[in-house]
Amino acid sequence: MTRSATIVGSGPNGLAAALALARDGIHVTVLEAESEIGGGTRSHRPFTTVDLLVDHCAGFHPMAVGSPALAGLEQHGLTWRWPEIDCAHPLLDDAAALLHRSVNETAVGLGADGKRWKALFGQPSSSYDRLSADLLGPVVHLPRHPLLLARFGAPTALPAAVLSRAFATPQARALFVGAAAHAMRPLTEVFSSAIGVGILTAGHHNGWPVAEGGTAAISRAMHSALIELGATVQTSTRVASRADLPSSDITIFDTTPSVVADVLGQELTTRTRRSYNRFRHGPAAFKVDLAVRGGVPWTDPRVAQAGTVHVGGSAEDTVAAEAAVAAGRMPDRPFVLVGQQFVADPQRADGDVVPLYAYAHVPAGLDHDVTDVVIDRIEQFAPGLRSRIVETVTTSPQSFAGGNANFVGGDILCGTSSPTQLLLGPRPGRDPYRTGTPGFYLCSAATPPGPGAHGMAGLNAARRALDDLLKR
C-alpha cells in the first residue's frame, strides 16, 4: 500500500521535506497558501520602467550550495554563480573589508589580523564537509565529529561584540560583526557569534553564490523534481483548520509553530500547544529595491565587485544599530544588507541599469516608511547614488507578512535566535521536528538549523517522519 504525506507550505524546507519523502516512494501533496510556490525563495520583476530580476527575500546562499537537501537539483536547472568578491563591508574614511572564498586571500587583506582570521576559520572551513553533518541538524544531538564540533562551537558561545575584540583592525572587526548581524539580534548576547561563525565558515568553504536566474530557481528545480516523482503541488490552498488537512500518514508543517497549534488544537499536548503559542518572533526587515543606472558609486571601487555588501559602518555602529532595533527603536543609521547579485548573474540587469537589493533591520511591525533612511545609509558609502536611481520599490514589514504567513511582523527569519530558542527550538525536548502528536511534524526555519534556503530543516523532519513510519 502506498503511503501518503501532506506538506503544508512550499518554502525551501517544505519542498525539501516533500522531495525526501517522494524519493522514498511516499505519495506527496504540497499545499501552498499563496499563488506562487517558494516562500522566501521567490524572485520577481517589480519595476515598471525597466526589466530587472529581483530576489524577494533570500539572495545569497553559503549554506545552500552543497546542502544534502538540494542534492541533484542541477539536473532540474539549478546553477550556482559566484561573484569575484563574496562580501564587502565598506568603512567611512578607511578601506573596505573584503571577504573572499579563500581564507588565505581574506587574511592577506586583513593585515595584522590575518593570522587570527585563519586561526578562527581556516581549520573549520577546510573540514566543513564533515562539520556540516553536525551543524545542519538539531543543536542537541550526539555529534558525529565531536572534536571538530567542539573546536567550532567554543567561539560561537561568545557575544559577537566580545569575539570581535579579538581582532585589532577595524576591517576584521566590522567583517565579523556584519556577518553576525545576519542573526538580527543583540550582538552583546551570548551565542550571538553563532550565525556569524557559521556563515563565514560555510562561506570560506562554499563561497557566497547566487542562483542563476534568481533565487526562485531553487524552488523551480525542487518543483520540477517533485513533479517528476509524481507529487502534487497545489497553490492558493490555505490550511487554517484541521478540516483543511487531507488524511495522510505523515503531515509536515513548513509554518510558524503557532499555525500548528491553531490547526491541531487539542491533538497537541497542552505543553506543546503552550510552547508553540509562546514562540517568539524577532525584528523585521524593511526592503528597498533600487533600479540604478551605471551601478553604485562606492567610495571604495572594489565594493562594486562584491555580491553581498554589509552597510553597517564600524563594528561599534553595527552593534549599536542591532541593540536599538531589539529595543524597538528605529536607528538613525541602521544595518543594511545590500545585494549586488547581478555581478555574478548579469541576466538580472537591463542594459546599464542594475537591480540593487537592500534591506534594513528594523523593529518588528515598523509602521512607517524608512525608504529615505535606507538610501541615505547606503549613500554614506556611495555618494551620488540618489542621482543614479531610476525607480524604487519598497517592501514594508506588513508587506512581507502579508505575502508570507511565516514572516510574522516582518520577521523574515521565522523566529528570534535568542539563546533559549537557539538551543531548545520551538518546544522543549530532544527533537524539534516532532510535535509530540504521532504523524505530525514541524520543519520551518523555526527549527534547526534555522533560516536559509538550504532546506535542511525539511530534510531532517522528513527523516524523522520516515523513521517513525517504519515503527508503526
Where are these regions (language model features)?
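N-terminal glycine-rich phosphate/pyrophosphate-binding loop and immediately adjacent elements
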Residues: 3-129
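Helical element adjacent to the flavin cofactor pocket in flavoenzyme catalytic cores
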Residues: 199-239
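A conserved FAD-binding loop/helix module that cradles the flavin
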Residues: 443-466
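Flavin-binding catalytic cores
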Residues: 116, 295-296, 329-331, 366-405
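Rossmann-like flavin
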Residues: 92-191
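Conserved FAD/dinucleotide-binding core of flavoprotein oxidoreductases
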Residues: 258-262, 291, 350-377
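A glycine-rich dinucleotide-binding beta-alpha-beta segment and adjacent secondary-structure elements
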Residues: 169-186, 333-337, 384-448
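Mid-domain catalytic core of redox enzymes
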Residues: 237-349
